[in-house]
Amino acid sequence: MEKKLLREGPYADFFSQGVQVGNVLTMAGQIAVDDNGNTPDDLKSQMIMCYENILKILDHFGGTLENVIDETWFVTDIDECMENVSEIFAEREKIYGCKPEVSQTLIGVNALVQPNLKIEIKCIAHIEK
């Protein structure tokens, strides 16, 4: 089995940001931390930054958001997410450029890797070789 890997960032020695086998690309969960280590305070801004990181991975493997087939969102405050779901999903549609045609799972968690994080997004994409 041939694997194509993307290892970068501060944890490159520990895991890959993306792994492609055949036409399937799995991505590590993406968090809202920029290249300088900064994280926005609010959920919507963190979601936007997660997608910015997802776009970088997709681009590395020759894909776009059109290739995403599945998303899993991990959020630390499910109530906050659901109270703002219309605004958050409207912003998500802007990022995708359309209503996303993906399966999606939303999971509430007690914590993420850093205490100020509110969301982590993990995606699977199908990219033709």
Please name every model-derived segment.
Residues 1-69, 75-129:
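N-terminal presequence-like segments and the immediate start of the first folded domain
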